[in-house]
């Protein structure tokens, strides 16, 4: 391909195709340094490359064709050479100006030869050597100057040689020079070539001359010395050469070339060398005029070079053509064949006819044909590699055709007038040449870019070689060898040429040698050389430079050495030179080439390199054949052939140098200057040897070393270059001049550039100087050699070449040393072969042959001539396993790239290529696979990068390894940030690809010995931002990381029920479709996130459920009609591995806000979620059908339960139960007990309300209250449960069972109060910074315990005992312990009575309950009331003691403890007492019965007295009085004895008295019994505590300071007080209460409930109650501030309490509550003021909050009764005056009531004091009246219960 391009480029440039031979060769060399890859093998390839790169006058390639087309065979030949050289040069220029010049050097050599021909006829006469010299110089200068000229030349290909050649130059020579100029100093080499004695010598010198110096090279002048070359021995040749050199001065040289008539093909060639040594056609020289004609045709300058001599130069142009393209090498070969003819021309002076005959193709044509055919096989390879134009076979054919044409075959091939031209060529080959070459040129040029040349070649039967053929036959051969070898190799080194060349060489060599006679041999040698050249080209392709430096380099070296060796062996001089060449390296290669030329056959062999050399040798050996076939003397043809072969063998420049050298000593290896040439050759040989040695090393330098021309090697090694230069110079003047070290380095530089090897790159720099044309030529040769080298590996004729190439290719170690990346088995490609041989010896030869075959296949597959296969491992079992890697210079291709390219190339093609080199190959079992198996697809992931620079070759291992390191850093960072771990993650890039400016990296991530799944690795790297990933990779990522394969779940129709559809808007068309796995995966991830989000939202409903894992599988993505590009996503979801029904999944997604969904999906959501199958399975309906009835049944049951429980609920509303829930459960238990005691206390309170019982109520109040308190704390729960069981409606409390209701209410109140007090206590504690909670808790507990004790006290007889039982009092205070012991003793006795009475009372109460239930009420408090009655009895009995206890704080303190101790008994008794109270047993005093009845009535009355004022005061009193209740109850004990009860004949009075008595009994129980024991303890505690706390504790606040002990007792008294005072109020103070406090209605509800009810009332009352509570705390604090002890129990507390009460009384609610508190039995009226303060306390507030209490109180106790009972019970101890005073305070609200109650309280207290010691007095207290009153009350209550209930509700 490259060759074709080269040719085309040359044509474009206007370089004559004929010139390609010599020029091309040089050109290639130059190119190769310049272009690097292109410089391989062929000038054309190089040229193409540059052309592509530069918009240089690349077009010249066609011009080249044109030049070739020049009419004159001579001009044509010159043109060919020039084209060859110039093309190369131009190519280089096109590609890189610097490179161009470098590359030109080699082409210059060829051009030089052309130039020689180009040179004036004298140059021709000079034999080829003179012409060559001239050409070389001309070429060199021309090259430098005429870079563009070649284009011009091409422009005028058909025109007269002058115009055509010189687009810049007048003659065809000008085009050649142009090319050369581009090539720069190629001509120099030609100068060095002396005409060998043999005919061929002259041609060779011409060829050498053909090497044209670059424009800047003055050295071309020296080159002219080439005259020694004249094969004919004609001395005119040198002059011609000189002329050429002159023309080499650049543009003018062409003219000189023109001077060369076709008769001296050499001269003509020299003439060609003129400008750029464009007329390197010198090879056309005399040898084969027919050849020349062909060359002319190729050149297309035929017209320009009408003259035969000029025609030859024109031929050179065609040669150039071949050089430019891959085929050009073949063309060069053809040219060489032509050259062979040319040599006849050159010999023309000497043996023009003989050579002409050869060229004539008389023999040649036949031979040529054969050879062409044979060559074609070779050529085919070459062609494929080189030119698209010429088939490889064509190229080969062309080459051989060229020879043939020169022989006659080429002519024949040249449709135009191949034979005729050839025939005419002898006489006036230029004309014929023009025609013939034109034809050839046309074909060549198109394929190579030198279409004309290619075509010409094809026409000639070697279409690729057409251009080459055009090169003079004799010279053409040389040129062909040089040009093809150098130019093509250089360009082919690009890839194409090399492979073909290899094939070509073997075929060519064999066929050519055999087929061609002397002329043919010469040509054949060129052919062989061409083969070699092609190999060289291949190497150059590797690098045209590659050839030099790349493995081809080593191969080339080896080949060259072998060639040289062969040449040396075959030809004595050549052999020696050849030998020297290996030694000298750079010089030697030239020498070898020259030597080969000189040796003719030997030279050819050597030139070919192993194969070529062999072939050449054979050809040389067959000089007879040649001679026989060729008309011209065999010697001449042989010489020509040798020269050609030598040239071909070497890179074109090298060949040129060799030709020059040969020209000097062509026959002897020193023609004109035999000694000089010999020495030069020797030097070259030495250099070559050295270089050869290096070359095998596979370094560019080595390659260069391998070549005689140091220039190529100079890239790597300047020394070599120098030696080469020296050698060349030594060999011949011209040669020496040409071989200037500077120039050579420059050429090599170009080649090196082409070569991937760094050495080559270095070499180009080394060869930067291009002073000597010879150097340029040498460089060209070197490039060619390099190219050849690779081809040799591939070449058939590899007897020598193959091993050398093999060594180079196989020696991976040597190659690896210069490779740009670290080699490992990961870069190896594995190919498995089946061989026919059972036993295969794995030898170096087998390795070499396989390497050659693989190289050939790779070059064809990559379409590059500089690609080489390096076999690293060769294993054999039943088959052969080959492990190799592909390189291009220093670049190593990734296995994936090689596998892909070979896969495209095809197994059959690879097999065919391998069979050419390994005949035993049976088949290819495994075409190509990675040596290490690749990880599975699901391990692989890809990253897509943008803006990867063109400089980065993504196919190279260097790029891959760099990206691996960067990716590793990125992954390590991601792992550290995301996983907080650090492990040695490794990256292995599997493949790279480039599409639409985005580079895709496919790689795997390994963790030690295992690989990460692609999904895992991609998700890890995706955690990093795109910016960060771009930072690590240095390129912005288009896709950060994406798995190559996605694990897909089942997406068949079986999952249809689970499908869900979501419609998005704004989805790009490129994203829709399942093929776009990336988008599908992204949407799956985002949808899974949405499911997780919905689950998180649902967690608040299902806290226990843990988030499961959702997996989303995309089923399909499709476009749907609608605006904004809607796309429909169908997917289904797995939750914890189980699929979700579509309906369920859609429902889940529908819970997510559409906006959030859009933000998550990054697209507008048109449809959130819609199930595909919308009807859920039938089983759902079944489930629903089953669940529905169950649900209905459940609802019905719930409703029934609610209805059945409604009564209880209603009863509890006013009761403590409502508040109890507010209280802690433990408090409930206490509440429960309190309720029992409280209810009883309430009954007792009711009794005291009846003035008769007023005395009892005080002690009873205290005791019961304390009990209640204890119950509050300890028995609230029990109370609750009991209440729940016995829950009565509020009206029940007021009903006949009012005793019970009163008791429960008081009990309830007590719990409520406890709760309220706790609240207050908390508030107070907050204010005091006291841990209220603890105190409250303690208070509640103690309160409960006191309540428990109080409940037993509730029984009037056992009240004292119950109180004593209260454990709290006893443990608390030691003094109380004594009292508690007394009380306990009393209690024990009382308990027995109480138990008795309880049974009766419970029986009675049960009856009452039944009645109440019938009426819709449940007398929950009844039980408590019974207990309360029992306790009351006890309290009455112990009243005096309890009073004392009350007075004594210690006793109080003990009392609570006692209560707590007795709590268990009390609890048990509570239940029983409740029952007994419910049905008072006869054992109980009438008082108890009265109390029992009274309570219900009280409850009724409470409802009746539910006036707002009463409630308010009640509440106030409850709060304040409760605490006071303690103190007062204690005080009251004394005062209460002075009964303040005013006996009232009316039932109301009786009931009031009952309540009073009950209250007093409770107060006595708490104050006396509990008070002395418990109460006194409580009192003591109260003393310790501020009075207010004590007071508060009664409601619930006092407990805090007292640690709850006092609080409990206090609380009870309060509850009892509440219950009792309320009845008192009810009887006497109701009206005033109403007046005093507007809010009573609410309190009345709570009234019956004691504390709990008060609390309820607080909540019920609402703001008022809360206000009261809020104010309550302050008073409570005030009270707290003054400890109870501090306050004189009576006065102080009274005063404060009164004040507080008054204050509260100011508030309606507080006033009301205060009044009830005052009424409590435990605290007689004195407490009225205190109760308000307590109400101010939180406790009071809580009481106030009790709405139920007021109602119950209203039902059971009239406010007046309360007030009366309160003063009596409350202030029993305080003086009556105190009571009044206190009353006066509340009296603000209702003074009369206060006053009235005071006396009654006093009386009751007194009576209580009297009665307390014994139960009898209490029992005797108007028992009959009380019973009667109770009964009446019960009746009234029964009547009022309904109303009451309603009110309470």
Swiss-Prot record:
Name the major location: membrane
Q: Topology in the membrane?
A: Single-pass membrane protein
Q: Name one GO cellular component term.
A: membrane
Membrane-spanning ranges: 1180-1200
Cellular localisation: Membrane
Note down the stretches annotated as region Disordered: 1-70, 142-166, 213-242, 529-586, 1258-1338, 1460-1546, 1656-1679, 1769-1819
InterPro entries attached to this UniProt entry? KIAA1549
In what ranges is there compositional bias, type Low complexity?
1769-1786, 1795-1809
Q: Protein name, please?
A: UPF0606 protein KIAA1549L
State which gene encodes it.
Answer: KIAA1549L
